């Protein structure tokens, strides 16, 4: 099994510096073009199936990557981004000003992060781990496309490397439409 792990394309909120989480923001033209370009790059890969987060930005990215390929796309709730609770839709700098300790903890001491009506990182990682187990336990054993979100990719990477949650930010930067192959 080979998993082609992709972060969704650039969104409007990405360009505005807003926290997305479970709230959606549409792809920008750049996000669409980047997804199509990645699809062109991967055109010779014979995907058995595609898994995606249920959020529209990930679904759209998946469709643009696959183009006219007739591939089964399965949405899996376990591949949703971290639920940032009341921070969602807000600009990072505003959240930092209003919740300085929790903002600091999220980025510097993730094990101490206490979400405001959102999801703890340990809960999130267990959800992502279950999603990966769903893929591994699926009937597919060839090339699999998985389109999801930055923190999900970081979590999968850290899980694969047996890193604790406090090392989640020590993983590589995950840009929009980036590709990681497992």
Q: Locations of the language-model features?
A:
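Short coil/turn segments at beta-strand junctions that form active-site/ligand-binding loops
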Residues: 1, 46-48, 140-144
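Short, basic/glycine-rich phosphate-binding loops at helix/coil junctions
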Residues: 15-18, 101-115
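Short amphipathic alpha-helical segments
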Residues: 17-18, 62-64, 157-160
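Short coil-to-beta-strand
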Residues: 1-10, 101-104
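Glycine-rich, phosphate-binding/catalytic loops in enzymes
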Residues: 21-23, 66-69, 91-92, 161-165
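Loop-to-helix element that buttresses phosphate recognition and phosphoryl-transfer chemistry
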Residues: 4, 10-61, 115-129
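Phosphate-coordination/substrate-recognition cap region in phosphate-metabolizing enzymes
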Residues: 39-103
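Active-site-adjacent alpha-helix immediately C-terminal to a catalytic or transition-state-stabilizing loop
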Residues: 59, 130-181
């Amino acid at each position: 099994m080979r998993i082609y792990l992709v972060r969704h394309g650039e969104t409007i909120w990405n360009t505005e510096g807003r926290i997305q989480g479970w709230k959606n923001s549409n792809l920008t033209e750049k996000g669409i073009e980047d997804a199509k370009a990645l699809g062109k790059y991967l055109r010779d890969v014979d995907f058995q199936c595609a898994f995606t987060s249920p959020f529209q930005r990930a679904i759209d990215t998946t469709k643009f990557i696959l183009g006219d390929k007739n591939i089964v796309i399965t949405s899996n709730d376990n591949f949703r981004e971290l639920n940032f609770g009341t921070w969602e839709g807000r600009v990072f700098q505003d959240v930092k000003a209003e919740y300085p300790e929790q903002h600091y903890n999220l980025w510097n001491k993730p094990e101490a992060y206490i979400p405001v009506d959102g999801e703890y990182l340990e809960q999130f990682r267990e959800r992502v781990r279950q999603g990966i187990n769903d893929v591994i336990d699926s009937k597919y054993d060839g090339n699999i496309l998985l389109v999801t979100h930055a923190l999900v990719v970081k979590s999968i990477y850290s899980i694969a490397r047996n890193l604790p949650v406090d090392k989640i930010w020590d993983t590589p930067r995950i840009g929009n439409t980036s590709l990681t192959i497992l």
